[in-house]
Amino acid sequence: MNLPLFAALVVILTLIMIKAAEQVAYPLTGYFSSLVSDYLEANQKLAPFYTHAPSIDGVKAAMAARDLFNTPRLALVNALNKQYETVKATDLIIANIQSLKDSNTYTVTTAHQPNLFTGPLYFIYKIAHTIALSRSLNKQMPEAKFVPVYYMGSEDADLDELGFVNIGGQKLVWQTKQTGAVGRMLVDVELLSLIKLIEGQIGVSVHGIAWVNLLKQSFTIGKTIAQATLEIVHHLFGAYGLVVVQPDSPDLKSLFTSVIEKELTTGFSNNAVQQTIKNLSVHYKVQAAGRAINLFYLQGNKRERIVQTDAGYEVTALGLSFTKDQILADVQNNPANYSPNVILRGVFQETILPNIAFIGGGGELAYWLELKQVFADAAVPFPVLLLRNSFLLVPAKRALQLQKMHINTVNLFKGRPQVIIDSFVKANSVHHLQINTQMAAIEAQYTLIKEQAAAIDASLVDHIEALSHKQAQKLLQVQKKMLRAEKRKYEAEQQQITKIMEQLFPGGSLQERTENIADWYKIYGTHFVDAIVENSDDFSKGFTLLYLND
C-alpha cells in the first residue's frame, strides 16, 4: 500500500473510532510532580539543568549541536541492518535505516524496557509520540529527515517491574525461574501459559483473537524477550517507519568503549552527577543517585555491579576480579559485557544515535535533568527533553453518563470517587449544604467575647479560644451529616460515579499506568494504535482525553 493511501485510511478509521478529544493542563491533573510542571512552564529554577528548550527552536539548536558531533552513522546502520535480518522490515523502515547514513538525518527517540507483552499503555503512548513528533518535524523542516526510534532497555534486570501485565483487571505474572537481564531471558512454558490465559480472556472477539495470535507469533519458545518485543513492536508500528534499536549488541557497545574506559579509570559520571544533585535537590526531589562506577558487568543473563578496589576491579556476585590493564583489555575485546546504569544509559544512547529529542515520562525527565554535566564531561550532545503524551480513554457509555451528570473533565482528576460524589451532590442539591457563612458569624462573635473577656482577665482568652475551636468542630460535624443525608438521595448517581472512576482510574491510578493494550486492541484492533498516533501532539500540550465511539 502506498503511503498517501495508508495515511488517508488511517485518518478515516481514526475518525470512526474517536468521537472527540480534549486536553487538561498537566498541573491540573494532580498526577505530575512540581519538577515536571516547572519544566513545562519554563521555570527559571530548572534552566541550568537542560541545554535546549522543548520547542521547535530547541530542536533546531539540538540539530546544530548534533552536526558538530561525530555520530558513528555507518556503524549504526550496519548494526541495525543485522538486527533487522530476523524481521521483515517495511520499505519505510529500510529507507529510514539507510537514511541514517546521511548527515541531515536525525532521530527522535523514546526508551523503555521490554515489559511483558508491552506492559502498561504508556509504552504505546511513548512510541506513538516519537512518530508524531518525527512526522511534524519532517513537515516543518523538509530539508532534513527525522526518524522515530524505540530504544529498547533490554539489559534491565528488574523482573518484578517488567514481568507482569494487567489485562481485564487481572494481574498476570510471569513465574519464570530465570534471572538477570530481562531482554536476554528466553520465552518458556510459564510465559506461554500466560498467553493461554489471555486467550481465555479476550479470545471471544475477532480483534481479541488477532492480538492473541500476534502474541503467539512473537513469543515462541526459546526466543529472547528482546527479540519477541522487537517483533511485536514492529507489528504495531512498522507501517509508520519506526526503527527499533536493540543496544545489547557487541557492534553498538564497541562504539562506546572510550566512555566505558573513562568511567572505569576516572569515575567521571558520579563526580558530575553529585554536584548536579546537590544543586537540584535545593528545590526538587532527586530521582536517581549515582554510584562510584555507573556500569554493570553482563555475563550470560547476569548483570552485576562493577566495584573498584585497591587491586583493581571486582564483580563480586560473579566471582570476577581484574587489574586495571586487564579490565581495559576486556573492554576492547568484550564490549558487550559492559552495561551502563541509569546515569550512563542516556550517554550510550546519544553516542550511537544522531538524536536530537528524547521523549520520556515524568520520572525519566527528572533523572535526565541530573545528567547535563555528565553529557558535557563525556563530550556527547544533550538532546531536547520532552514529556511524553498522556491519554485517558473514555468509552462512549461513560462519556454519556458524565455528560448527563454535568461532571467536567478537571473533576475527574480529583482522585477518590468520594471527592467527586461530594462535589456532584453539592452542585446538584437544592439545599445549602455548607454553613461557612454561619460559622464565620459565630467565629466573629467569639472574637468579640474574647476581646471583652481579655479586658477583664487575660487568663480567660485561652478558655474562650478552646470553646470557639470546640464549637467549630461540632458545626463541621453538622455539615458532614447534612451532606451524608443529602447524598442518600443520589444513590444511583453515586454508583455510576464509582463505576466510572473504577474504569477510568483503575486501582486509583492513571489508566495508562495500569492497563495493557490488549484491553483496547480486542475492541478496536489496529485502529487503536492508529488513533493514538493521530491524536498524539508533537510538543505535548496537555493530558488528552479521548472520547471513544462504540
Task: Label each residue range with its predicted role.
Residues 18, 232-322, 418-421, 425-550:
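Long, compositionally biased intrinsically disordered regions
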Residues 31-91, 475:
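Low-complexity, highly charged intrinsically disordered N-terminal segments
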Residues 103-138, 360:
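N-terminal catalytic cores of NTP/NDP-binding nucleotidyl/phosphoryl-transfer enzymes
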Residues 120-121, 134-158, 383:
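Glycine-rich phosphate/pyrophosphate-binding loops
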Residues 121-122, 159-165, 255-260:
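Short acidic, glycine/serine/threonine-rich loops at helix termini
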Residues 159-166, 394-422:
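A structural-propensity feature for long, helix-poor, extended segments
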Residues 166-193:
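A glycine-rich helix N-cap at a beta->alpha junction
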Residues 287-356, 362-373, 382-384, 391-395, ...:
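A translation/RNA-centric and nucleic-acid-associated enzymatic feature enriched
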